[in-house]
């Protein structure tokens, strides 16, 4: 019996728990690494000249859409965007994109990984 118990403990110790991706401002859970899509990382410059290092996720349940969608100055051809904000503190985290499908482009410096 002792041997079986030992094996059970060894099995449990091998289980890796996935870390959540958090809002850097309030630590609200935004998404998880398993929702990352490829290509995952991009650097873009907006028309005002600001650069953003963006991480793409198929979903970000902790981020809400804010504002009207527009395809103006979209970084992804065929996609319209709206702002993505933290559901808890309303901090701007990036953008939601809608086109053939929907995904979130989140600003790396506004996340805690």
Spans of features found by a protein language model:
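A short Gly-Trp-Pro
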Residues: 1-113
């Amino acid at each position: 019996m002792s041997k079986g118990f030992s094996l059970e403990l060894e099995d449990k110790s091998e289980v890796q728990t996935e870390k959540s991706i958090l809002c850097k401002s309030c630590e609200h859970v935004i998404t998880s690494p398993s929702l990352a899509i490829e290509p995952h990382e991009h650097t873009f410059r907006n028309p005002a000249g600001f650069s953003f290092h963006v991480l793409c996720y198929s979903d970000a349940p902790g981020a809400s859409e804010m504002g009207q969608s527009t395809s103006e100055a979209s970084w992804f051809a065929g996609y319209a965007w709206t702002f993505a904000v933290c559901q808890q503190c309303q901090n701007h985290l990036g953008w939601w994109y809608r086109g053939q499908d929907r995904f979130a482009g989140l600003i790396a410096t506004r996340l805690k990984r």
